[in-house]
Amino acid sequence: MKASELRAKSAGELNQELLELLKAQFSLRMQLATQQLGNTSQLGKVRRDIARVRTLLQEKAVQK
């Protein structure tokens, strides 16, 4: 997910996206623990997406 796509979203939409990403991260961690995860790079991608969303939420909070 690109930062430019995220910047177009509102704070509410970003919070919703963050919740979805956190659920996905939890699911991937459980798959990793049970050795069902084939592509471990997905964990890093989701982690970076979470960081992007949190950064944009913080930027929006500072702008207010």
Curated annotation (Swiss-Prot):
Entries under Pfam families matching the protein: Ribosomal_L29 (PF00831)
GO biological process assignments: translation
Top-rank taxon, per record: Bacteria
GO molecular function: structural constituent of ribosome
GO cellular component: cytosolic large ribosomal subunit
Listed PROSITE patterns: RIBOSOMAL_L29 (PS00579)
Keywords: Ribonucleoprotein, Ribosomal protein
NCBIfam families: L29 (TIGR00012)
The family this protein is said to belong to: Belongs to the universal ribosomal protein uL29 family.
HAMAP family for the chain: Ribosomal_uL29
Record protein name field: Large ribosomal subunit protein uL29
Source organism per UniProt: Aromatoleum aromaticum (strain DSM 19018 / LMG 30748 / EbN1)
